[in-house]
Amino acid sequence: MRKIIHVDMDCFFAAVEMRDNPALRDIPIAIGGSRERRGVISTANYPARKFGVRSAMPTGMALKLCPHLTLLPGRFDAYKEASNHIREIFSRYTSRIEPLSLDEAYLDVTDSVHCHGSATLIAQEIRQTIFSELQLTASAGVAPVKFLAKIASDMNKPNGQFVITPAEVPAFLQTLPLAKIPGVGKVSAAKLEAMGLRTCGDVQKCDLVMLLKRFGKFGRILWERSQGIDERDVNSERLRKSVGVERTMAEDIHHWSECEAIIERLYPELERRLAKVKPDLLIARQGVKLKFDDFQQTTQEHVWPRLNKADLIATARKTWDERRGGRGVRLVGLHVTLLDPQMERQLVLGL
């Protein structure tokens, strides 16, 4: 049986700011773009969350909920430095680390000899070490599979941990709301509840064939998770799959010429970011994203071997003409999908 730990830093960006400026510790703060530029909140500390401020919330809405919110632009070099230090702490216990973002990761400690092989004690020691060396708190979940470890890490936040032993899995799943399973959003949860399916215990009584017919691939995943099945390994070789850049406008745009001008300004930044990870600029696909004034969004991609501005502009124009439907546009984004390493190797061998 595997021993998986999911470590999740507590309001990470905000925690770094409060550590470096203790005057911020007891007041509501958030990291995000300004209201004037129609930004969104990256994260908020717990005093701000008491007012309902949440990640991905428009800054304007956050300021309505909490007028005295202190808004910070973010210091991503500081967050990256702290993240690298945290990852180095992880590596003292195992080489099998799968970072999910700057502030969370999976660790497989099945074969670790630290703490007499106890995943519970390893998680506790990691959290204590992070606090000792960085003055930041972390929460952790321990379980035999990845999705349960992730759920567990949220059970005793902040600065806590929760353990689900193999023997406890069946009872834990019986009453676990389906909405807690990573990947089950509000819409899916509502559809499932309309079918009388609210917990994993409910799904355990369902016929797999019925779930496959109703939900396709998602139906199988739902059935497996409800049985406690998650065969995904902790992938220490997880690679970045895409690079993107986007801009939210202060005012909605309604004319193609405005959109084209924004693309002209975004393209050099996309090129710069891509060059950091792929100096030859070879890619699998490139595409554009438009978000409209009703917050609906659309993405259009085009297979293309190398970053190409003219093709991006042509793709954006086609998307603008066919999908806008007279709506104002509040966000324009450009992105590329990177080549799969195996595919890239095959292409090189083919030459």
From Swiss-Prot:
It catalyses: DNA(n) + a 2'-deoxyribonucleoside 5'-triphosphate = DNA(n+1) + diphosphate. GO terms for cellular component: cytosol. It is found in: Cytoplasm. Binds 2 magnesium ions per subunit. Mg(2+) binds at D8, D103. Its cofactor is Mg(2+). Its EC number is 2.7.7.7. HAMAP family: DNApol_IV. Poorly processive, error-prone DNA polymerase involved in untargeted mutagenesis. Copies undamaged DNA at stalled replication forks, which arise in vivo from mismatched or misaligned primer ends. These misaligned primers can be extended by PolIV. Exhibits no 3'-5' exonuclease (proofreading) activity. May be involved in translesional synthesis, in conjunction with the beta clamp from PolIII. This is DNA polymerase IV. It comes from Escherichia coli O139:H28 (strain E24377A / ETEC). The lineage of its organism: Bacteria, Pseudomonadati, Pseudomonadota, Gammaproteobacteria, Enterobacterales.
